[in-house]
Design a protein with these regions (language model features):
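Glycine-rich portal/gate segments that line the openings of hydrophobic small-molecule binding cavities
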Residues: 47-94, 147-155
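Beta-strand elements of well-folded, non-transmembrane domains
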Residues: 19-21, 67-69, 81, 96, ...
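Hydrophobic ligand-binding cavity/cleft-lining segments
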Residues: 1-56
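Hydrophobic pocket/interface hotspot
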Residues: 25-30, 36, 61-63, 79, ...
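Beta-strand/loop substructures that line and gate deep hydrophobic ligand-binding cavities in soluble
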Residues: 91-143
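Generic structural detector for well-ordered beta-strands
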Residues: 14-20, 47, 64, 78, ...
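A short, structured loop/turn motif at beta-sheet edges
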Residues: 22-24, 54-55, 80-87, 105-114
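Short, surface-exposed coil-to-beta transition loops
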Residues: 12-14, 72-76, 99-102
């Protein structure tokens, strides 16, 4: 399930997905940046520029990504919170958004894992960004998270 909300010029995306895995297995997968390749659409040309290390608070991760054809952008995030194996937060340090804060949480529910994502984001360029980019970014993020959900089902529902 993917839902969007817009309040005070900050958009919020929420998604939940049940997976037949343990907390440990979910943490091992989601806390490793190298697995982002497996759940990001190929057309985004996603590339991580930093070494893959065990996640820790304060960790900086640099990426290159193409959110739109022929448009490549650098993106730097910082891991600002880690509670293994239940939650972590990454925040944009620099990149395409005025604000990007992605909270990942994992909990057991009916002998399955419930993976929850809450992404708070603010578009650049103020009113112009919201008028011209709001619907486009919402559409893109929806497609990205739909793809991610399908890939996670393929990986873990074998």
């Amino acid at each position: 399930m993917i839902t969007f909300n817009n309040q005070n010029k900050v958009y919020t995306l929420k998604t939940e997905q049940e997976l037949p895995i343990t907390l440990k297995k979910s943490w091992d997968f989601f806390s490793s940046p190298k697995n982002l390749f497996k759940i990001t659409p190929e057309h985004m040309n996603f590339k991580i520029l930093t070494d893959f290390k065990k996640m820790y608070e304060g960790q900086i991760i640099k990426y290159k990504v193409s959110p739109f054809p022929f448009f490549r952008v650098g993106w730097t995030t910082k891991i600002t919170y880690v509670e293994e194996p239940f939650s972590f937060i990454d925040k944009q340090v620099s990149g395409p958004f005025r604000l990007w804060e992605h909270t990942h949480t994992f909990k057991k529910k009916n002998n399955k894992l419930l993976a929850c994502d809450i992404v708070k984001y603010k578009l650049p360029l103020g009113l112009i960004g919201r008028i011209f980019g709001g619907a486009i970014v919402k559409y893109q993020l929806n497609k990205i998270f739909e793809y991610r959900n399908k890939q996670l089902n393929k990986i873990f529902n074998k």
